[in-house]
Amino acid sequence: MSKRDYYEVLGVGRDTSEREIKKAYKRLAMKFHPDRNPGDKAAEASFKEIKEAYEILTDSDKKAAYDQFGHAGVDPNRGGHGGGQGDFGDIFGDVFGDIFGGGRRGGGQRQAARGSDLRYNLELSLEEAVRGLTKELRIPTLAACDLCDGSGAKKGTSATTCGTCHGQGQVQMRQGFFAVQQACPTCHGRGKIIKDPCGKCHGEGRVEKSKTLSVKIPAGVDTGDRIRLTGEGEAGEFGAPPGDLYVQVSVREHAIFTRDANNLYCEVPISFSKAALGGEIEVPTLDGKVSLKIPTETQTGRMFRLRGKGVKSVRSHAVGDLLCKVVMETPVNLNEKQKELLREFEATLTGESKKHSPKAEGFFDGVKKFFQDLNS
């Protein structure tokens, strides 16, 4: 009788993530578990089929072999464990191990995998990024099962040596002239079999869980900075070390300031009269308002530097500056008296535009010369 497609057994697609495959397995395993279906041979057969499919599709090597060769690529009956095939494994293990510098691993047991690293995207306001703070983060992860202490075996039981690979975690497959080693499909490369799996983690040794961490964000962080929290990633397989958590920082746009490295920039509107006559204006900083002296005859677009009013570097602790660009605003909603005063002022400039507006005079001289050259 031909076997069903493993992806069909679990009801997943070929591009489904490992986490989703695990979710599908747990859902089906709970449904067809023999403890929930006592005496039901069909349910027992389905449970075995589901477990077999899960073991293949969550092992990267076996999954790759299955995707390429189908059931033939993961069927241990197509290989062997005795006779001269062990010699082939020794020969090729020695030769290729010496060539590639890895040393011969032979039939050594596969080590339980380290936990996966996790990434958390953290968005901060500019004020939070500049000043630093402590954030409470809720992290979905895989944690060691507290019922079986991460062993995967039912409480009071333990794993037994795999009869297929005899505890080695690897078997040999014959492919023509070559004998190739691969992870044992029976024990998933561990060298041990869990006959009585834990009812909580279903033999995985890990369960999905959310945990809350207090993370200190240093002052001066910026978009693209990454904070590493060692050991706060997913739990490792069956007691292996956990992964790490990486907090990826991004800073929201600010209504007033823009940031470039450790410097801050802002635009400050000033009136026509203030630009012409000079005076003091108030400008915003992250520490509050400060006074800025505007010289007489200040042109729009002029930049003023306030030293030490920028951001303290998270690495060197040097402090940047605040650069204020003044922008002269044209007055609006004028009454008749104000308009008349401006007309009188404009009249006093007649014939003296070069004296009072040197940039404009230079501009119009350039335009005049342009058309003269164009028509010559």
Swiss-Prot record:
GO molecular function: ATP binding; heat shock protein binding; unfolded protein binding; zinc ion binding
Binding site for Zn(2+) 1: C145, C148, C198, C201
GO CC annotations, alphabetized: cytoplasm
Cofactor(s) the record lists: Zn(2+)
Main location: cytoplasm
Recorded coiled-coil stretches: none
Gene3D superfamilies: DnaJ domain, Heat shock protein DnaJ, cysteine-rich domain, Urease metallochaperone UreE, N-terminal domain
Cofactor note: Binds 2 Zn(2+) ions per monomer.
J domain sequence ranges: 5-70
Zinc finger (CR-type): 132-210
Domain of life: Bacteria
Keywords from the UniProt entry: Chaperone, Cytoplasm, DNA replication, Metal-binding, Repeat, Stress response, Zinc, Zinc-finger
Biological function: Participates actively in the response to hyperosmotic and heat shock by preventing the aggregation of stress-denatured proteins and by disaggregating proteins, also in an autonomous, DnaK-independent fashion. Unfolded proteins bind initially to DnaJ; upon interaction with the DnaJ-bound protein, DnaK hydrolyzes its bound ATP, resulting in the formation of a stable complex. GrpE releases ADP from DnaK; ATP binding to DnaK triggers the release of the substrate protein, thus completing the reaction cycle.
Domains: entry comment: The J domain is necessary and sufficient to stimulate DnaK ATPase activity. Zinc center 1 plays an important role in the autonomous, DnaK-independent chaperone activity of DnaJ. Zinc center 2 is essential for interaction with DnaK and for DnaJ activity.
Protein family according to the UniProt entry: Belongs to the DnaJ family.
Record protein name field: Chaperone protein DnaJ
Organism of this sequence: Shewanella frigidimarina (strain NCIMB 400)
